Amino acid sequence: MTRPIQASLDLQVMKQNLAIVRRAAPEARVWSVVKANAYGHGIERVWSALGATDGFAMLNLEEAITLRERGWKGPILMLEGFFHAQDLEAYDTYRLTTCIHSNWQLKALQNARLNAPLDIYVKVNSGMNRLGFQPERAQTVWQQLRAMRNVGEMTLMSHFAQADHPEGIGEAMRRIALATEGLQCAYSLSNSAATLWHPQAHYDWVRPGIILYGASPSGQWRDIADTGLKPVMTLSSEIIGVQTLSAGERVGYGGGYSVTQEQRIGIVAAGYADGYPRHAPTGTPVLVDGIRTRTVGTVSMDMLAVDLTPCPQAGIGTPVELWGKEIKVDDVASAAGTLGYELLCAVAPRVPFVTT
């Protein structure tokens, strides 16, 4: 028998999350973002559940080719564009839409020998300061691209740095307005947070990512609790050991948790080698046999300990939800000082996945 830990994916929930995105941005088309192997869910496992999308957005050329080979004929947007000039041959073959964010890409595209023009997303730096042309250069770049024989349809894109704040896109929108003054173009600006909370930035295409998987772009579940979005992934395991401890005994490496009175502790087959956060402190929420309780002590490589006081009936084989429909990944991440994004992306290869 295999270890009892597994990650279950509810693909019907993913379909529902996409429908919620469409209701949030009814006038825009949707790029479903499946970068980082679909945020750790597995692009080959989930892409068909997003089949009603208008396009897929990602980074990895191999994953884009996989989607084409699986039968996806719609648009595919490469969010960071091509990394080497020779990649343009594959972009041409598989008809990929490329982001252009730097001068060397302009030159490579101009010099490429393509069978047909590629659709282009021109990235403007609106304050994130990662990729993109400065706003004052945007129109010059736009005109350079418009003159190239290798360029098809063009869209202006940017990425908001603070869309999870109520006033978080004001300065970015000012920069974008400066960049596009007098320019007639399509726009793709909204990430997950802007899709939910800034309808003035929806324009032509929105790019939801984390919300498709049922986690919060702000890192706080309460911020999306009333949207109807639900978690797609449930990471679960079982209790494989029980200890009844007396006052003064300690649990785990370093003895970080001290028992104050007689207490039953359950040992769960899950640890940081599975992707559970090592820095999750005592008190991190967990569900045992449908009852909310807490972790105790330090998370080990392959195991963690939970307090069985609220669930005295629990024993060997009792099911444990580490995160999912009841224990939100955002809440586990918050306890561990990180984000749900990281935990979803970090589920280890040794954890088996099942889809429903």
Swiss-Prot record:
Source organism, top-level taxon:
Bacteria
List the active-site residues: 35 (proton acceptor), 253 (proton acceptor)
Q: Give all N6-(pyridoxal phosphate)lysine modified positions.
A: 35
One Gene Ontology term of the biological-process aspect is: D-alanine biosynthetic process
- Signal peptide residues on this chain, from the entry's feature table: none
Q: Which GO terms describe its cellular component?
A: cytosol
Q: Which residues bind substrate?
A: 130, 301
> Which EC class is the enzyme in?
isomerase
Enzyme Commission code: 5.1.1.1
GO MF terms held by the record? alanine racemase activity; pyridoxal phosphate binding
Q: Which UniProt keywords apply?
A: Isomerase, Pyridoxal phosphate
**Which Pfam families does the record match to this protein?**
Ala_racemase_C, Ala_racemase_N
Identify which cofactors the protein needs according to its UniProt entry: pyridoxal 5'-phosphate
UniProt xrefs under InterPro entries? Ala_racemase (IPR000821), Ala_racemase/Decarboxylase_C (IPR009006), Ala_racemase_C (IPR011079), Ala_racemase_N (IPR001608), Ala_racemase_pyridoxalP-BS (IPR020622), PLP-binding_barrel (IPR029066)
Q: Which reaction does it catalyse?
A: L-alanine = D-alanine
Question: Activity regulation per the record?
Answer: Inactivated by D- and L-beta-fluoroalanine, D- and L-beta-chloroalanine, and O-acetyl-D-serine.
Q: What does this protein do?
A: Isomerizes L-alanine to D-alanine which is then oxidized to pyruvate by DadA.
Q: Which PANTHER family match?
A: ALANINE RACEMASE (PTHR30511), ALANINE RACEMASE, CATABOLIC-RELATED (PTHR30511:SF0)
The entry describes its oligomerization and partners as:
Monomer.
Similarity comment: Belongs to the alanine racemase family.
HAMAP family named among the record's database cross-references = Ala_racemase
Would you tell me the protein name for this molecule?
A: Alanine racemase, catabolic
Species per Swiss-Prot/TrEMBL record: Salmonella typhimurium (strain LT2 / SGSC1412 / ATCC 700720)
